[in-house]
């Protein structure tokens, strides 16, 4: 293990050493670039593009390109990127993660690799965690730098309409958010008109700001486009009413994993309450699902920590950023269970229409890189999942922040008292203070305690996130006290006011350790930017959630130790206790990493299926002649279906049975002539099958040509039939695929997904998922064939959207998936 870590460490040093050689070449061109006139920069960009087209690589162009960007940045913004920013930019171009501390200038750093990679003609996406940051860069001086260099730059945000998005995606460099990118991808793959597609260029290169937040913290949160599901509001209310009657003996909570189940007594109580014999009978599966959600809502989800209630709505709080997740809902009915718990309006439950995780979305890019101040603790995950190394970039000026050892207490109350005392002492000196909390609830507790001591302060949490920029702008001024959840202005520097450096800079006080050391480091990183002085210290207790949930039996020994060394409730430091908390964090980080890897294994099954479906959709959507695709599908389907009828061509009634089968399954009645079919059956089986297939192909071609002529004459549009065929095929695919996604979700639960870590459950999911997928593909092809061959006459045909009901009538989706078993057929390209 030590050898492996040493190898990784040496690899990072080696990468930085190589980057220095390149950075020196960039610096050596500083004087040359300073001689250029403003109008020369566009000319120089065109020259670099031509050199790339003639065969020079981006690596060969890098020194000149970066030097050009440095000079352009200086002229437009008045700021010259430091040497360390050049190092970071080189690491980004190499497809790795540049770990740059707060205030080291990640924004300027990103311009260089974005410019260089845009010279290839492929788009570059600079991805931020929120629209505020994307707008700031696009609308400010940063966007002007790209224009000065002769590149186009765009912005893609939620409020953009289709035309605005299309223009933005055509730009050389695009500023956008991770969520908008993902949703655009899903929406494009649900589109039925190619003219409305917004992402028409390849996924070439992405630079992700706050990369750990997006690829680690949000990795377990899928992007979902949902649609209305069945109405079940009464069940949520009934389950909520039942759970309110429970006592501790009726349920069992596993604190570490936050899972909850009914005990035997709880099951008996449920069966009595709902007047049923067996709660686990298949007919009560929906009721059981609602009870489980109600249990989670009541006993594992906490108001002002996991969610908040505002204007009669339940709003999710992001556990890593502290922000409200606008427009998001907890999935699988949990959100509705929380609404029932809080007595607010229960929204319509939704089912999944399309979904993708950030893990799989960003792996669509040919090259991926990222920036953050805190990635080193997660470098194994970045390497294993995304094939990116984390390279620590040195600071431009030495880091002089003082990070004091944790203050440790037995009780939370003792901890809060000491925190307030420290705040009072430093506030009297005029030193600005940032108090970091893990939840909205704790931030409000601290606020009340400060108010009792007449300390004027600002509070920044999910309830008033709209004031974030204003609060952060003042957080570094003399006498300011700011309480913040871990949203704490990430992406925005806290600048010190006049005279604050002499007072020791910003003091950061943490109210408890987070599950991840990385989040702790982010809080510390608010102080000590760009060589400024600063101070940080965490206040922790044995009653903190981290210790209670993950401490296990050792927590009792820790409490005993604390009581021995601290009999007065005063602050104390203990290396042993600090190490105990650090070990817990490492354990949780490792467990979360394992869980994300396990989730990815499951999601990769969906990814393969999704890519097959989306590839087929694109072929149909972009084809100038979709009727040819339809004819090919129809021929394959029917040709396969008729094979059993040709095993014995001498059977006297075989032609009649074949015609009956075809006209019942696919064709309109009266399509076939019995004498023509009988004549074919007079030949040998193999010859007869070959001839009949030709006969069928001719029939289908004639039907399509007749339909095409009729549709085009009726609507006076030579392209109308193509549009109708395309619409029918896409709608059939979409309706079945939406159902398939939800079936896969049911399957995931059915194979015991909650008990992850058992290889058997994954193999079962993989096998049954393939069966479901094959069945879906068969149904899609059958429906396309039948729908097209039985098209209504033109005079009765309405515009495509009004025909949706005639496409899919089979609503008998089999939810008892795990009981089915059959041989697995591997489908990679099912329709080709």
Swiss-Prot record:
It is found in: Cell membrane; Cytoplasm. It is a peripheral membrane protein. SUPFAM superfamilies: Helical scaffold and wing domains of SecA, P-loop containing nucleoside triphosphate hydrolases, Pre-protein crosslinking domain of SecA. Its main location: membrane. The keyword tRNA processing does not apply. InterPro entries: Helicase_ATP-bd, Helicase_C-like, P-loop_NTPase, SecA, SecA_CS, SecA_DEAD, SecA_motor_DEAD, SecA_preprotein_X-link_dom. Keywords: ATP-binding, Cell membrane, Cytoplasm, Membrane, Nucleotide-binding, Protein transport, Translocase, Translocation, Transport. Residues 801-832 are annotated as: Disordered. Its EC number is 7.4.2.8. One of its GO terms (molecular function) is protein-exporting ATPase activity. It holds the Pfam family SecA_PP_bind. GO terms for biological process: intracellular protein transmembrane transport; protein import; protein targeting; protein transport by the Sec complex. It comes from the Bacteria. One of its GO terms (cellular component) is cell envelope Sec protein transport complex. ATP binds at residues 85, 103-107, 493. CDD domains: DEXDc_SecA, SF2_C_secA. Residues 818-832 have a biased composition (Basic residues). It catalyses: ATP + H2O + cellular proteinSide 1 = ADP + phosphate + cellular proteinSide 2. Belongs to the SecA family. Part of the Sec protein translocase complex. Interacts with the SecYEG preprotein conducting channel. Has a central role in coupling the hydrolysis of ATP to the transfer of proteins into and across the cell membrane, serving as an ATP-driven molecular motor driving the stepwise translocation of polypeptide chains across the membrane. Monomer and homodimer. Part of the essential Sec protein translocation apparatus which comprises SecA, SecYEG and auxiliary proteins SecDF. Other proteins may also be involved. PANTHER family: CHLOROPLAST PROTEIN-TRANSPORTING ATPASE, SECA INNER MEMBRANE COMPONENT OF SEC PROTEIN SECRETION SYSTEM. This is Protein translocase subunit SecA. The lineage of its organism: Bacteria, Bacillati, Mycoplasmatota, Mollicutes, Acholeplasmatales. The gene is secA.
């Amino acid at each position: 293990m030590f050898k492996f870590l040493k190898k990784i460490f040496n690899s990072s040093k080696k990468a930085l050493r190589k980057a220095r050689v390149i950075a020196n070449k960039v610096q050596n061109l500083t004087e040359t670039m300073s001689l250029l006139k403003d109008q020369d920069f566009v000319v120089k960009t065109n020259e670099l593009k031509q050199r790339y087209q003639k065969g020079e690589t981006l690596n060969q162009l890098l020194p000149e390109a970066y030097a050009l960007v440095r000079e352009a940045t200086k002229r437009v913004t008045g700021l010259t990127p430091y040497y360390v920013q050049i190092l970071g930019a080189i690491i980004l171009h190499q497809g790795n993660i540049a770990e740059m501390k707060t205030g080291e200038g990640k924004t300027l750093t990103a311009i260089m690799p974005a410019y260089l990679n845009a010279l290839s003609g492929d788009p570059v996406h600079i991805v931020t965690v929120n629209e505020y940051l994307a707008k700031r860069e696009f609308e400010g001086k940063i966007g002007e730098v790209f224009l000065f260099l002769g590149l186009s730059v765009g912005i893609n945000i939620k409020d953009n309409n289709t035309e605005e998005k299309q223009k933005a995606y055509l730009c050389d460099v695009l500023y956008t958010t991770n969520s908008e990118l993902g949703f655009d991808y899903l929406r494009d793959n649900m589109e039925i008109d190619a003219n409305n597609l917004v992402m028409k260029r390849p996924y070439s290169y992405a630079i992700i700001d706050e990369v750990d937040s997006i690829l680690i913290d949000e990795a377990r949160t899928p992007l979902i486009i949902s649609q209305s599901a069945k109405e079940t509001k009464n069940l949520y209310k009934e389950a909520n009413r039942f759970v309110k009657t429970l006592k501790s003996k009726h349920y069992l909570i596993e604190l570490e994993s936050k899972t909850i189940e009914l005990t035997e007594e709880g099951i008996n109580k449920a069966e009595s309450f709902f007047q049923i014999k067996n709660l686990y009978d298949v007919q009560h599966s929906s009721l059981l699902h609602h009870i489980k959600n109600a249990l989670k809502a009541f006993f594992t989800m906490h108001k002002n920590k996991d969610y908040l209630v505002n204007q009669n709505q339940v709003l999710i709080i992001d556990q890593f950023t502290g922000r409200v997740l606008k427009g998001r809902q907890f999935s699988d009915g949990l959100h509705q269970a929380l609404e029932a718990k809080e007595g607010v309006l229960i929204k319509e439950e939704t089912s999944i229409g399309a979904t993708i995780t950030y893990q799989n979305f960003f792996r669509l890019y040919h090259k991926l890189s990222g920036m953050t101040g805190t990635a080193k603790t997660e470098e194994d995950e970045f390497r294993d999942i995304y094939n990116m190394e984390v390279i620590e970039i040195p600071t431009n000026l030495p880091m002089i922040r003082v990070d004091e050892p944790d203050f440790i207490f037995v009780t939370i109350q003792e901890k809060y008292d000491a925190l307030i005392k420290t705040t009072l002492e430093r506030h009297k000196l005029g030193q600005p203070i940032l108090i970091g909390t893990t939840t909205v609830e704790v931030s409000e507790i601290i606020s009340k305690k400060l108010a009792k001591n007449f300390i004027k302060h600002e509070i920044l949490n999910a309830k008033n996130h709209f004031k974030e920029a204003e609060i952060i702008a003042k957080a570094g001024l003399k006498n300011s006290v700011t309480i913040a959840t871990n949203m704490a202005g990430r992406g925005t520097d806290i600048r010190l006011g006049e005279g604050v450096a002499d007072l020791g800079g910003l003091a950061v006080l943490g109210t408890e350790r987070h599950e991840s050391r990385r989040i702790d480091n982010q809080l510390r990183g608010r102080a000590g930017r760009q060589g400024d002085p600063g101070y940080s210290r965490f206040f922790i207790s044995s009653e903190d959630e981290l210790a209670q949930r993950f401490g296990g039996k050792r927590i009792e020994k820790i409490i005993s130790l604390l009581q021995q060394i601290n009999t007065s409730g005063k602050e104390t430091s203990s290396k042993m206790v600090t190490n105990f908390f650090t070990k817990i964090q490492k354990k949780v980080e490792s467990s979360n990493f394992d869980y994300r890897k396990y989730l990815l294994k499951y999601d990769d099954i969906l990814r393969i299926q999704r890519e097959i479906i989306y590839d087929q959709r694109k072929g149909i959507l972009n084809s100038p002649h979709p009727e040819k695709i339809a004819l090919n599908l129809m021929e394959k389907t029917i040709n396969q279906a008729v094979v059993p009828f040709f095993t014995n061509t001498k059977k006297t009634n075989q032609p009649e049975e074949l015609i009956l089968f075809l006209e019942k399954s696919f064709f309109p009645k009266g399509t076939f002539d019995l004498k023509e079919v009988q004549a074919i059956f007079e030949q040998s089986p193999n010859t007869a099958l070959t001839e009949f297939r030709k006969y069928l192909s001719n029939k289908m071609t004639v039907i399509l040509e007749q339909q095409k002529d009729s549709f085009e004459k009726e609507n006076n549009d030579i392209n109308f039939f193509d549009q109708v065929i395309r619409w029918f095929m896409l709608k059939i695919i979409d309706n079945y695929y939406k159902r398939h996604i939800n079936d896969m979700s049911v399957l995931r639960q059915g194979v015991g997904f909650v008990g992850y870590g058992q290889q058997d459950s994954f193999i079962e999911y993989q096998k049954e998922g393939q069966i479901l997928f094959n069945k879906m593909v068969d149904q899609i092809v059958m429906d396309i064939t039948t729908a097209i061959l039985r098209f209504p006459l033109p005079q009765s045909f309405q515009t495509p959207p009004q025909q949706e009901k005639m496409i899919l009538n089979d609503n008998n989706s089999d939810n008892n998936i795990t009981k089915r078993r059959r041989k697995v057929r591997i489908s990679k390209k099912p329709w080709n």
